[in-house]
């Protein structure tokens, strides 16, 4: 069993989604290769089971998400403006640090995101990647009520983009080559 270091928590994994990024990492077909050996999985949900030195939150027993962004420096121009995803020192879960396709994972406590008990682990897991990706797009586009939004490709991310756009009150146009996906 892994042991959490300073600033880390040990998470007992309840659910881990499979993303195409995990498949690319396993096949090694991206220009940036994962750190070997590695455990893939960046769509993990679990409960904090142990605390490393200096960690008081999240508390033991807290249900948390492990996302693609496993850690960032916290002090560069990107991090201090809330754009940690652009940090040049970021470490990605299941790629640069071991991921959630295991019974336990060690996670940077700053990036272990509490998950409400009202959301099942099955529902929460894909939100840590596809959900965050599509939410970020809707947010970056500054979609407002009554605006028209076209979503191209109604697959794993597209169906979430439709839901987020509707939640902000947009009129959504779904576009796909598959008639089945448009139903």
Regions found by a protein language model. Give the residues of each.
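Short Fe-S-cluster ligation motifs
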Residues: 45-51, 101-123
């Amino acid at each position: 069993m892994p042991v959490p270091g300073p600033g880390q928590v040990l998470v007992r994994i309840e659910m881990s989604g499979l993303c195409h990024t995990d498949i690319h990492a396993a096949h090694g077909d991206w220009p940036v290769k994962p750190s070997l050996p590695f455990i893939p999985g960046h769509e993990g949900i679990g409960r904090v089971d142990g605390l490393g030195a200096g960690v008081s939150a999240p508390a033991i027993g807290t249900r948390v998400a492990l996302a693609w962004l496993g850690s960032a420096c916290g002090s560069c121009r990107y991090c201090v403006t809330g754009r940690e995803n652009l940090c040049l020192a970021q470490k990605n879960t299941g790629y640069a640090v071991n991921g959630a396709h295991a019974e336990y994972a060690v996670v940077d406590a700053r990036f272990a995101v509490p998950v409400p008990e009202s959301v099942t682990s099955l529902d929460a897991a894909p939100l840590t990647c596809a959900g965050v990706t599509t939410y970020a797009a809707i947010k970056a586009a500054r979609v407002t009520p009554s605006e028209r939004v076209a979503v191209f490709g109604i697959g794993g991310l597209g169906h979430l983009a439709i839901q987020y756009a509707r939640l902000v009150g947009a009129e959504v146009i779904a576009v796909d080559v598959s008639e089945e996906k448009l139903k």
